[in-house]
Amino acid sequence: MEHATSARLTFVLIARVPPDGVAGFQAYEAAVLPLLGEFGGLLERRLRNADGTIEVHIVSFDSDRNFQRFRADPRRAAVAHLIEASAARNEVVAMTDVAEWPRGTLPGAS
């Protein structure tokens, strides 16, 4: 798996999806995630709970301009009905890298 460097912009998406919206949410993601690379984006991690009602993405972009271009892409708009119908509540948070903790210094670590 390729990892982002500190020069990249990193975002975390936390999606909370009602059980009856999971299929629509996943259809939207299947249509949209392949577009990331066209805009300097990279899906670093994609995590999901067992029933698909919570999904977390760690995504990075090479520039804010490309992130904005990705968000404005008409292909995303064309499938927006899927995410809307899913009733997913999405939170996108900009994040920054933190220096690694020295081994054994985290609370509770030994």
Tell where the protein language model's regions lie, with residue ranges.
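Short, conserved catalytic or adaptor-binding loops enriched in Gly and charged residues
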Residues: L35, L82-S86
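Short S/T/G/P-rich N-terminal loop/turn motif that feeds into the first structured element of a domain
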Residues: M1-A72, A77, N90-S110
